[in-house]
Amino acid sequence: MEKLLSTGKTKAIGVSNFSKAEMERLVQNTSVVPAVHQLEGHPWLQQRSFVDWHKSKGIHVTHYSPFGNQNEIYSSKVQIGKLIDEPVLAEIGKKYNKSSAQVALGKFSCRPIQAGNNVY
């Protein structure tokens, strides 16, 4: 990937689902810091300190799975329910005339956006 970047065939390098140890190793052992890291992120999995770490390194974070994992096949024997059924989200939604799904989406869409200075 670093070679592609130097040829101009790509504009940036991004990663997905790396742990902090993997990210630290990547930053220490490569010549290019990733521009973006895609992580699972929702009210049950906010990863605030990891997101702050990325910010300190100049790495933009994007999130996927804003409603948590809705697929029961991945869950253990313990039933944890669905994020969109979370009573706290429903209560906040009721206060603002929004669904719990809209509240969950709003949690991450209200974060500050890092703006780049290149226009592609």
Please name every model-derived segment.
Residues 1-120:
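Beta/alpha (TIM)-barrel catalytic core signal, keyed to glycine-rich beta->alpha loops juxtaposed to Asp/Glu
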